[in-house]
Amino acid sequence: LTGIFISLEGPDGSGKSTAAKKIVPQLQQLSTQEVVLTREPGGSAIAEQLRDIILDVHNSAMDARTEALLYAAQRRQHIVDVILPALQANKIVLSDRYIDSSVAYQGAGRQLGMQEIWQLNLFATQKLLPQLTLYFDIPPAVGLKRIQQKRAQAADRLEKEQLDFHQRVTAAYQQLIKQDADRIVKIDAQQTPDQVVADCLAIISQRFNLGD
């Protein structure tokens, strides 16, 4: 694979989705490679249908293992439809969430076991990992407060979970960072949005020698 694969991770309300939209045009100026922004859950037609099922607030009866399997399923389809073709075409793929989200949210948040969810997703992804993951670091209470202020009515099924769920998610992310410090780089997500974007671009440029 000749392209570059970057994922953005973080708790709910960390601002990564907003930052991603700003990073893309600036990253495009630094690189001759086409930049593709995608997201999980979703990113392609079938995966977006699975997203709707996963995040629907009416599906409160969904079993935790079902949820984990659906996330793995949408990820597989997203890889086949979007990520692999883009990487094979020498593009830069920026994915808003990827495998670490499942390990943190289903492994720790839902208490299914981080190792079990990691194994499930290695099967789904055929071990395709990003070369770089930017982790938007923010205390869970701050992230949830942002969601309540901005879009409380539109919060999805996982965003509506209690604080202890989100604390387990954040603790799991910190554990993943320790285990894979080469791949996962922390960004201070409590800075101004512009500073967050600037930090992301600096790390990406340095890691992949862009804009020299």
Language-model features: where?
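Hydrophobic positions on the alpha1 helix immediately C-terminal to the Walker A/P-loop
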Residues: 19
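Pre-Walker A (Motif I) flank of P-loop NTPase domains
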Residues: 2-5
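Hydrophobic anchor at the beta1->P-loop junction of P-loop NTPases
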Residues: 8
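ATP-dependent small-molecule kinase phosphotransfer cores
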Residues: 30-125, 199
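NTP-dependent small-molecule kinase module
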Residues: 22-24, 141-212
